């Protein structure tokens, strides 16, 4: 019982182009990768990009340049959706924190607020042991 080609076309979703003027850029900068998600005010994702998804593998993912390329890619897609103003929320200690924000700014998107939302424990879980190199 073969499925017709019509069935596959129904499953493939067409990207809906939204017209959103301002949103939030969530930058998650870990030591291994940088993830940029651009959402509207309600938190619905408009675009996202990762350093690994831009073709960087291994230790090159954790570079500021990889974060810059990922931010440019996510920002361009968001601009196509109509984004003009952004709040930037940065989470994590990674090397791509600053370069991701600079890349978004260079695209011509107006950045209103830069906020650090890195979670800090009030002495919660025991951290991993110290690395000895």
Curated annotation (Swiss-Prot):
SUPFAM superfamilies: Translational machinery components. Pfam families: Ribosomal_S11. One of its GO terms (molecular function) is rRNA binding. Keywords: Ribonucleoprotein, Ribosomal protein, RNA-binding, rRNA-binding. Gene3D superfamilies: Ribosomal protein S11 (3.30.420.80). InterPro entries: Ribosomal_uS11 (IPR001971), Ribosomal_uS11_bac-type (IPR019981), Ribosomal_uS11_CS (IPR018102), Ribosomal_uS11_sf (IPR036967). GO terms for cellular component: ribonucleoprotein complex; ribosome. GO terms for biological process: translation. Part of the 30S ribosomal subunit. Interacts with proteins S7 and S18. Binds to IF-3. Located on the platform of the 30S subunit, it bridges several disparate RNA helices of the 16S rRNA. Forms part of the Shine-Dalgarno cleft in the 70S ribosome. HAMAP family: Ribosomal_uS11. NCBIfam families: PRK05309.1 (NF003698), uS11_bact (TIGR03632). Belongs to the universal ribosomal protein uS11 family. This is Small ribosomal subunit protein uS11.
């Amino acid at each position: 019982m073969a499925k017709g080609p019509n069935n596959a076309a129904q499953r493939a979703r067409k990207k809906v182009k939204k017209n959103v003027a301002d949103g939030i850029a969530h930058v998650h900068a870990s030591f291994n990768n940088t993830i940029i998600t651009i959402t509207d005010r309600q938190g619905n994702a408009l675009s996202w990009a990762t350093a690994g998804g831009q073709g960087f593998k291994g230790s090159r993912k954790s570079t500021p340049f990889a974060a810059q390329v990922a931010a440019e890619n996510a920002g361009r897609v968001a601009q196509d959706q109509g984004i003009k103003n952004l709040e930037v929320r940065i989470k994590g200690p990674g090397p791509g924190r600053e370069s991701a924000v600079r890349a978004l700014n260079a695209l011509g998107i107006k950045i209103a607020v830069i906020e650090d939302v890195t979670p800090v424990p009030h002495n919660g879980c025991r951290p991993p042991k110290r690395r000895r190199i």
